Amino acid sequence: MKKILLTAVLCIFTIFIEAQENKFAANRSENAVALITSQLEISDADAEFIQQTLYNKYASNARKIRGKGLSEDEKKAVYRTAAKETRQKLMTKFNREEVQKIIDLERESFKK
């Protein structure tokens, strides 16, 4: 009985921790998509695709970096890899110019 209770408590704690991380990724991706949709004419489906892609990028980066004690160079390597993967994923739906504009607007959203 103690093992079941302990397992349940650990699962709830893990879900709570994961929800906090996802909240950051969700907020950041929502802000970026809001700016992107205000500047570019894209469909709701494309906006949803961009938001999900950016959310996955931010959440993945956080999982790879948080609590790992990585150096600045190692963090930059994680960010570069994620940026390349995101660019490739966006290229499946958008052309090169649109992808560059999306990335520029995403970066601009960090400053707001």
Which role fits each region the language model picked out?
Residues M1-F24:
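Bacterial Sec-dependent N-terminal signal peptides
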Residues Q20-K112:
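Charge-rich (acidic/polar
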